[in-house]
Amino acid sequence: MYTGLLHTHRTVAYLFLLATVALILLAIFRRISGTSSTDSKQALLAKIALISGHTQLLLGLGLYFLGPWFEQLTSNTAEVMKTAELRWFAVEHIGANLVGIVLLTIGNSKFKKAADGQSKDKAVLVYFGLGLLLIASRIPWDRLF
Protein backbone atom coordinates (compact mmCIF):
# COMPACT_ATOMS: atom_id res chain seq x y z
CA MET A 1 0.00 0.00 0.00
CA TYR A 2 2.84 2.39 0.85
CA THR A 3 4.50 1.85 -2.55
CA GLY A 4 1.25 2.50 -4.41
CA LEU A 5 0.68 5.72 -2.47
CA LEU A 6 4.25 6.80 -3.17
CA HIS A 7 3.92 6.25 -6.93
CA THR A 8 0.59 8.08 -7.01
CA HIS A 9 2.07 10.94 -4.97
CA ARG A 10 4.92 11.28 -7.47
CA THR A 11 2.59 11.11 -10.48
CA VAL A 12 0.17 13.73 -9.17
CA ALA A 13 3.18 15.97 -8.49
CA TYR A 14 3.75 16.29 -12.24
CA LEU A 15 0.14 17.39 -12.80
CA PHE A 16 0.37 19.87 -9.94
CA LEU A 17 3.63 21.39 -11.17
CA LEU A 18 2.43 21.60 -14.76
CA ALA A 19 -0.90 23.24 -13.90
CA THR A 20 0.57 25.68 -11.38
CA VAL A 21 3.45 26.78 -13.61
CA ALA A 22 1.06 27.18 -16.58
CA LEU A 23 -1.32 29.24 -14.42
CA ILE A 24 1.47 31.54 -13.24
CA LEU A 25 2.88 31.94 -16.76
CA LEU A 26 -0.59 32.78 -18.08
CA ALA A 27 -1.01 35.43 -15.37
CA ILE A 28 2.41 36.90 -16.22
CA PHE A 29 1.55 36.96 -19.92
CA ARG A 30 -1.79 38.63 -19.20
CA ARG A 31 -0.09 41.28 -17.03
CA ILE A 32 2.56 42.01 -19.66
CA SER A 33 0.10 42.15 -22.56
CA GLY A 34 -2.41 44.23 -20.60
CA THR A 35 -5.25 41.77 -21.12
CA SER A 36 -7.77 42.31 -18.35
CA SER A 37 -10.68 40.11 -19.39
CA THR A 38 -11.43 36.99 -17.40
CA ASP A 39 -10.27 33.79 -19.01
CA SER A 40 -11.90 30.37 -18.67
CA LYS A 41 -8.49 28.73 -19.21
CA GLN A 42 -7.17 30.56 -16.18
CA ALA A 43 -10.09 29.39 -14.03
CA LEU A 44 -9.62 25.81 -15.22
CA LEU A 45 -5.88 25.87 -14.50
CA ALA A 46 -6.53 27.33 -11.03
CA LYS A 47 -9.01 24.55 -10.32
CA ILE A 48 -6.64 21.83 -11.56
CA ALA A 49 -3.76 23.30 -9.54
CA LEU A 50 -5.87 23.48 -6.40
CA ILE A 51 -7.36 19.99 -6.75
CA SER A 52 -4.02 18.38 -7.57
CA GLY A 53 -2.39 20.29 -4.70
CA HIS A 54 -4.98 19.08 -2.22
CA THR A 55 -4.70 15.55 -3.61
CA GLN A 56 -0.94 15.78 -3.08
CA LEU A 57 -1.54 16.87 0.49
CA LEU A 58 -3.85 13.95 1.23
CA LEU A 59 -1.52 11.44 -0.41
CA GLY A 60 1.43 12.97 1.43
CA LEU A 61 -0.36 12.72 4.77
CA GLY A 62 -1.11 9.08 4.03
CA LEU A 63 2.55 8.47 3.24
CA TYR A 64 3.62 10.39 6.32
CA PHE A 65 1.52 8.40 8.77
CA LEU A 66 2.00 5.02 7.05
CA GLY A 67 5.69 5.43 6.29
CA PRO A 68 8.90 5.09 8.27
CA TRP A 69 9.27 8.83 8.98
CA PHE A 70 6.41 9.06 11.43
CA GLU A 71 7.35 5.83 13.16
CA GLN A 72 10.91 7.06 13.67
CA LEU A 73 9.73 10.51 14.72
CA THR A 74 7.45 9.14 17.42
CA SER A 75 9.94 6.59 18.73
CA ASN A 76 13.12 8.69 18.71
CA THR A 77 12.48 12.38 18.07
CA ALA A 78 15.92 13.57 19.15
CA GLU A 79 17.70 11.26 16.70
CA VAL A 80 15.41 12.31 13.83
CA MET A 81 16.14 15.98 14.52
CA LYS A 82 19.90 15.32 14.49
CA THR A 83 19.84 13.52 11.13
CA ALA A 84 19.40 15.95 8.21
CA GLU A 85 17.61 13.58 5.82
CA LEU A 86 15.20 12.26 8.44
CA ARG A 87 14.45 15.77 9.70
CA TRP A 88 13.90 16.96 6.14
CA PHE A 89 11.21 14.35 5.44
CA ALA A 90 9.70 14.19 8.93
CA VAL A 91 9.42 17.94 9.54
CA GLU A 92 10.58 20.31 6.78
CA HIS A 93 8.98 18.65 3.73
CA ILE A 94 5.54 18.24 5.26
CA GLY A 95 5.58 21.61 7.06
CA ALA A 96 6.57 23.71 4.05
CA ASN A 97 4.20 21.88 1.73
CA LEU A 98 1.31 22.29 4.14
CA VAL A 99 1.90 26.05 4.30
CA GLY A 100 2.24 26.11 0.49
CA ILE A 101 -1.14 24.39 0.05
CA VAL A 102 -2.72 26.86 2.48
CA LEU A 103 -1.36 29.71 0.32
CA LEU A 104 -2.82 28.07 -2.80
CA THR A 105 -6.19 27.73 -1.09
CA ILE A 106 -6.20 31.39 -0.02
CA GLY A 107 -5.10 32.40 -3.52
CA ASN A 108 -7.88 30.39 -5.13
CA SER A 109 -10.45 32.02 -2.86
CA LYS A 110 -9.16 35.50 -3.73
CA PHE A 111 -9.01 34.51 -7.41
CA LYS A 112 -12.66 33.46 -7.42
CA LYS A 113 -13.81 36.56 -5.53
CA ALA A 114 -11.84 39.04 -7.67
CA ALA A 115 -14.00 41.31 -9.76
CA ASP A 116 -11.64 41.99 -12.65
CA GLY A 117 -8.85 40.27 -14.55
CA GLN A 118 -6.05 42.30 -12.97
CA SER A 119 -7.15 41.32 -9.47
CA LYS A 120 -7.32 37.68 -10.54
CA ASP A 121 -3.82 37.87 -11.99
CA LYS A 122 -2.52 39.50 -8.82
CA ALA A 123 -4.03 36.74 -6.65
CA VAL A 124 -2.45 34.10 -8.89
CA LEU A 125 0.96 35.75 -8.94
CA VAL A 126 1.11 36.43 -5.22
CA TYR A 127 -0.51 33.38 -3.63
CA PHE A 128 0.02 30.67 -6.22
CA GLY A 129 3.52 32.02 -6.87
CA LEU A 130 4.53 32.01 -3.21
CA GLY A 131 2.85 28.64 -2.67
CA LEU A 132 4.69 27.12 -5.62
CA LEU A 133 7.98 28.64 -4.51
CA LEU A 134 7.57 27.21 -1.02
CA ILE A 135 6.50 23.79 -2.30
CA ALA A 136 9.26 23.68 -4.92
CA SER A 137 11.84 24.45 -2.25
CA ARG A 138 10.89 21.23 -0.45
CA ILE A 139 10.36 18.82 -3.35
CA PRO A 140 12.83 15.92 -3.26
CA TRP A 141 13.97 16.59 -6.84
CA ASP A 142 16.40 13.66 -6.83
CA ARG A 143 13.49 11.27 -6.19
CA LEU A 144 10.98 12.89 -8.53
CA PHE A 145 12.56 11.89 -11.82
Regions found by a protein language model. Give the residues of each.
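Membrane-embedded alpha-helical bundles that constitute the cytochrome b-like, heme-associated redox core
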Residues: 1-145
